[in-house]
């Protein structure tokens, strides 16, 4: 089997470290693994498989000879290095939002639109984590009858805001238990024992940038240019795994039983739907998992062809690192 030279840009962050883990778990054919980061992190050492790898400084020259570069860095870093990566001949699988809506860049969820990988011109974008979790959960419905609209409410874990999110949550819980004052730094308000109904800045007509991603990215991934989505994104005091409540309206009626059958057979999904026995998806159960758990499937009482669905997925794994490695697997298939 052919082996590939792989680099991870932003290797020392949470997603970069998870990419290392997933590459090993999936036995990706790596001949060389290069870990790239800022000057602050360069020179450090990270374990991978049975050896230690020294973190290198991210610079244009670092991509020479690479076959695949997995991006786990912020938008500005992705934009800064993308030209050098493409010039080097490597394919850049980027987890940032920098290129997602570029018409020349495929936006890929392997369970949904794997064929779009072939359209790349050197860059393939990884979708937003909430988009991935939501669309994997409902793609089987779209294959049965086209989805016309979605109303979504997301319950997003603090780790989605970076490594500082869980630390701030734990520190606040401890401080409040001791009767101490807290000063939020990562989030705009106290997150312990609270929910914050804003993720991202205002983008369009009262919607935030995070909320518009599900519509904009969903249209591109599912090839549904007329898809309408109304979304509210909420930060909740959960450490890991995002949850999403979805009202999905399809062109033709899909029964609850048919929906359960479709989702149970769908790649990337696990049906957990037994209300009588209190079995349904929860963040605790999906953390450190690659599958999206789907349940609470029931008719929407406000529309003819609507279904209510609840899903949970690990935003660091399937929502980021695993999806990127799956794209890399498609590239070498």
What are the functions of these language-model segments?
Residues 1-191, 227-228, 292-293, 297-303, ...:
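N-terminal Rossmann-like NAD(P) cofactor-binding subdomain of oxidoreductases
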Residues 9, 69, 158-333:
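Charged docking surfaces used in two-component/phosphorelay signaling
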């Amino acid at each position: 089997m052919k082996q590939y030279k792989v680099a991870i840009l932003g290797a020392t962050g949470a997603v970069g470290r998870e990419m290392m883990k997933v590459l090993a778990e999936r036995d990706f054919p790596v001949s060389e693994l290069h870990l790239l980061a800022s000057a602050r992190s360069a020179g450090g050492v990270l374990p991978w498989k049975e050896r230690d790898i020294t973190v290198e400084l991210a610079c244009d020259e670092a991509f020479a000879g690479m076959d695949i570069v997995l991006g786990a860095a912020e938008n500005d870093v992705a934009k800064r290095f993308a030209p050098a990566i493409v010039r080097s001949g490597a394919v850049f699988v980027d987890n940032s939002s920098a290129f997602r809506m570029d018409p020349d860049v495929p936006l890929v969820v392997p369970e949904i639109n794997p064929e779009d990988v072939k359209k790349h011109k050197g860059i393939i974008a990884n979708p937003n984590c909430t988009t991935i979790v939501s669309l994997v959960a409902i793609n089987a419905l779209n294959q049965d009858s086209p989805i016309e609209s979605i109303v979504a409410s997301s319950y997003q874990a603090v780790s989605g805001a970076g490594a500082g999110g869980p630390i701030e949550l734990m520190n606040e819980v401890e401080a409040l238990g001791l009767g101490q004052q807290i000063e939020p730094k990562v989030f705009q308000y106290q997150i312990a024992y609270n929910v914050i109904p804003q993720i991202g800045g205002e983008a369009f007509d009262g919607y935030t940038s995070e909320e518009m991603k599900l519509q904009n990215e969903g249209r591109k991934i599912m090839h549904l240019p007329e898809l309408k989505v109304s979304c509210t994104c909420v930060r909740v005091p959960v450490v890991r795994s995002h949850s999403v409540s979805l009202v999905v309206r399809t062109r033709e009626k899909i029964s609850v039983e048919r929906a359960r059958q479709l989702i149970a057979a769908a790649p990337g999904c696990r049906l957990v739907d037994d209300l009588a026995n209190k079995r349904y998806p929860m963040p605790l159960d999906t953390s450190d998992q690659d599958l999206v758990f789907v349940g609470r499937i029931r008719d929407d009482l406000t529309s003819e062809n609507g279904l209510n669905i609840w899903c949970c997925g690990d935003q660091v794994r399937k929502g980021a690192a695993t999806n990127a490695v799956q794209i890399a697997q498609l590239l070498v298939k």
